């Protein structure tokens, strides 16, 4: 711990940042401006050292950005200051791109890492507002409000999400997953409220208060990596619990004219408290012992087929060779097992039901899917027969074990082209399904379970389960989930209920009836 603290606090970047900050504090004529300078020269570089690889280009970017911030104190010409502020803005853009790259390498999974990604992206917004302040751009607000927005996106929108992400590497719970999106949306909602709607600002602050106090409670229930880190992080989060109350008073005054709180008071108390206690103690706490990510590296086989399926060969009887590879079949009706192993002996009838709120999107997508002949579901809920064929796929083209394509049609239109395979991890076999798309492929990794005589296939299970988009070498987890429930209702007749959600919200339900030919 001491070695790590020494390597971070006494790194050339940190020492230079502290030196530049001290020099800036001597040169500045407005001491309150130092709250943003502290973030730009000390807090942001320290946090980035915990996130970015120590590559030469990253170090050079940091040095250039810090030097530009310091030179703002000594360069007298407005043109020179604009150039220096622009350089810093480019640096924040670089950080945002790195956060975006992290996100696209992983997708909608792991709220802790998403929080870090969003924090890095938000820094660019802070850089834009800082440039607007230095350049004197008319944003529609006073120069002070423009500067306050810049500091808002350095502390509330960068330091807090990064700190929240590090905390999530140590603590994961339903409450944590609830407050993360609230805190991540908070900076934007508060900024929009300040700009356009005092009432929205008031509501946003109320939500923010709920999330912050929940975070404080969670912090006091969490075991940290060292005793000193425990003290520092709890104090840092607790400081937010105090300063956010003054934000509420300020928002209440703007909305209803009650409990007058001036900008001057917010600068002296709210800003200084956030800078010294939340910012400084929080950064020191994470620098002590940076928690390691718990994000798994996905290494399951991915279909290499993109666009229109080519290389479909001879007819294949079933979606799987042996259902027993996936699940214990002794408790399942024989018809379910037979259907999966001899799919070509069955007829399939479907009724597609789109959620009312999603129908406009479904209609728009139908214009695209008709041309793609993929994921081309009917808009009507009328019961219709899906005809199909199962064809073997060249394993050398696909890259997975023993792939076969299930090609389903409604009349002359292809509805699905799904290439089935499987892979095994940690003693469990998963269904590995690919749906080729232009220059990409949608991948569904499903876990199979036999429960009370029913077969359940779900993308919300263990290990690799999920729905992904594969493009090039990137594998992006989508905010989608699917769940199949298959029963034998009458001897020889199966029903299957297929439900899909986006961001946890139901948007599609397909009812299938399956009977032998």
Predicted regions span which residues?
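Soluble ligand-binding/transfer domains with enclosed cavities or grooves
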Residues: 305-510, 515
């Amino acid at each position: 711990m001491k070695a790590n603290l020494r390597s971070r606090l006494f790194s050339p970047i940190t020492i230079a940042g502290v030196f530049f900050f001290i020099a800036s504090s001597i040169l500045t004529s407005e001491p309150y401006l130092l709250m943003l300078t502290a973030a730009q020269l000390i807090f942001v570089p320290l946090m980035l050292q915990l996130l970015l690889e120590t590559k030469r280009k990253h170090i050079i970017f940091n040095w250039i950005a810090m030097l530009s911030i310091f030179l703002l104190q000594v360069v007298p010409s407005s043109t020179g200051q604009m150039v220096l502020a622009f350089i810093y803005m480019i640096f924040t853009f670089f950080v945002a791109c790195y956060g975006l790259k992290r996100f696209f390498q992983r997708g909608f999974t792991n709220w802790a890492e998403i929080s870090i990604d969003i924090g890095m992206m938000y820094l660019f917004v802070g850089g834009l507002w800082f440039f607007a302040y230095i350049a004197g751009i008319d944003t529609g607000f006073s120069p002070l409000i423009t500067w306050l927005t810049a500091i808002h996106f350095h502390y509330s929108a960068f330091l807090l999400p990064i700190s929240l992400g590090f905390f999530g590497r140590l603590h994961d719970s339903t409450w944590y997953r609830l407050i993360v999106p609230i805190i991540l949306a908070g900076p934007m909602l508060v900024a929009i409220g300040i700009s356009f709607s005092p009432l929205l600002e008031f509501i946003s602050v109320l939500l923010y208060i709920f999330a912050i106090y929940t975070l404080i409670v969670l912090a006091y229930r969490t075991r940290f990596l060292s005793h000193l880190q425990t003290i520092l992080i709890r104090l840092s989060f607790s400081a937010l619990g105090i300063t956010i109350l003054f934000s509420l008073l300020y928002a209440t005054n703007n909305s209803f004219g009650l409990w007058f709180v001036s900008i001057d008071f917010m600068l002296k108390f709210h800003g200084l408290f956030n800078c010294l206690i939340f910012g400084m103690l929080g950064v020191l706490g994470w620098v002590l012992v940076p928690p390691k990510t718990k994000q798994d590296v996905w290494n399951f086989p991915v279909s290499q087929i993109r666009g229109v399926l080519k290389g479909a060969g001879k007819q294949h009887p079933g979606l799987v060779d042996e259902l027993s590879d996936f699940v214990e079949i002794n408790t399942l009706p024989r018809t379910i097992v037979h259907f999966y192993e001899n799919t070509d002996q069955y007829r399939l009838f479907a009724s597609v039901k789109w959620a009312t709120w999603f129908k406009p999107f479904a209609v728009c997508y139908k214009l695209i899917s008709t041309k793609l002949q993929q994921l081309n579901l009917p808009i009507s809920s009328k019961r219709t027969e899906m005809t199909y064929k199962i064809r073997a796929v060249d394993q050398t083209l696909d890259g997975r074990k023993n792939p076969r394509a299930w090609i389903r049609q409604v009349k002359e239109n292809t509805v699905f082209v799904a290439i089935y395979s499987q892979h095994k991890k940690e003693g469990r076999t998963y269904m590995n399904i690919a749906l080729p798309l232009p220059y990409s492929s949608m991948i569904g990794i499903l876990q199979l379970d036999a429960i009370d005589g029913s077969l359940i296939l779900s993308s919300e299970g263990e290990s690799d389960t999920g729905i992904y988009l594969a493009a090039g070498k990137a594998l992006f987890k989508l905010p989608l989930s699917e769940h199949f429930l298959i029963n034998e209702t009458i001897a020889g007749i199966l029903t299957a209920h297929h439900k899909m959600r986006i961001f946890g919200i139901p948007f599609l339900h397909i009812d299938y009836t399956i009977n032998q030919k």
